[in-house]
Swiss-Prot record:
The protein, known as: Elongation factor Ts
Major localization class: cytoplasm
Organism: Ralstonia pickettii (strain 12J)
One matching Pfam family: EF_TS
Gene Ontology molecular function: translation elongation factor activity
The organism's taxonomic lineage, starting at the top: Bacteria, Pseudomonadati, Pseudomonadota, Betaproteobacteria, Burkholderiales
GO cellular component, one term: cytoplasm
């Protein structure tokens, strides 16, 4: 068998991004054959990805890419906050955002089949799972085209993209507003009907407990609903930099119109797994006793 040299390990690592020890093991198993060792690692990394695929990914990053009148916002998830700061993970997310803007995939499946360099997005994702040891998923994305665009990222956990006409500074302020106040829609008319119905139901229950006449109760309910609509629609919110005016008034003063926006918050709506360390240890002890 050929001697396994440091240069061979380094060459295999450069090709596969696998950890050094994994590269050495693969070369040993392949008896020094680089091509065979690369194939062994591809299989191993794929197996790691398969094992990791069932694990919850509630951490991650939001990335934005804007080029002229085309842009994209994407959320890519991982398992831990630590990995969300990994350079390879961040580079992958930024490449994905750029690819979405340039290629206009219909959905995550179509995106996964596109290429980053010589590999598909899915192949790169699988390789990174094997290298880093955590599950990673492309959760969602939104693409914009044919309009002025601006984006705002609050760190890597909150991202907003705004389609607008007019002044970019004002549009950027609107994006920052969305990141800070997290509206669910652009205008009150756009608030999803199910959210309005839920808020109305809560308001009706509270108003009914007041014991006031029906006509007063009806006004109380309507007042509560209108207040809610103003709180959750971007244009109707008090502007965070000057609460004496609404976002809509701020934009109008700058001759700017926001046509649409997308807001992503990392892990929003994903139920995180709560680890019970004591229960985990107890289970391991019980399993060990059964094997004894």
């Amino acid at each position: 068998m050929a001697a396994i040299t440091a240069s061979m390990v380094a060459e295999l690592r450069a090709k596969t991004d696998a950890p050094m020890m994994e590269c050495k093991k693969a070369l040993t198993e392949a008896e020094g054959n680089l091509e065979k060792a690369e194939e062994i690692l591809r299989v191993k990394l794929g197996n790691k990805a398969g094992k990791a695929s069932s694990r919850v990914t509630a951490e991650g990053v939001v990335a934005a890419f804007v080029e002229g009148t085309t842009g994209a916002l994407v959320e890519v998830n991982c398992e831990t906050d630590f990995v969300s700061k990994n350079d390879d993970f961040l580079a992958f997310t930024n490449e994905v955002a750029k690819l979405i803007a340039q290629k206009n995939p219909a959905d995550v499946a179509a995106l996964s089949a596109l290429s980053i360099g010589d590999e598909t997005v899915e192949a790169v994702r699988t390789r990174l799972i094997g290298k880093i040891g955590e599950n990673m998923t492309i959760r969602r994305f939104q693409r914009f085209e044919g309009t002025q665009l601006t984006s705002y990222l609050h760190g890597t956990r909150i991202g907003v993209m705004v389609a607008f006409e007019g002044n970019e500074v004002a549009a950027k302020d609107a994006a920052m507003q969305a990141a800070a106040m997290k509206p669910v829609s652009l205008s009150a008319d756009d608030v999803p009907a199910e959210l309005v119905a839920k808020e109305r139901s809560v308001a009706e229950q509270k108003a009914a407990e007041s014991g006031k006449p029906a006509e007063i109760v009806a006004k109380m309910v309507e007042g509560s609903v209108q207040k809610y609509l103003k709180e959750v629609s971007l244009l109707n919110q008090p502007f965070v930099k000057n609460d004496k005016q609404t976002v809509e008034q701020m934009l109008k003063a700058a001759n700017t119109t926001v046509k649409a926006f997308t807001l992503y918050v990392v892990g929003e709506g994903i139920e995180k797994k709560q680890d019970d360390f004591a229960a985990e240890v107890a289970a391991q002890v019980a399993a060990a006793k059964q094997q004894a």
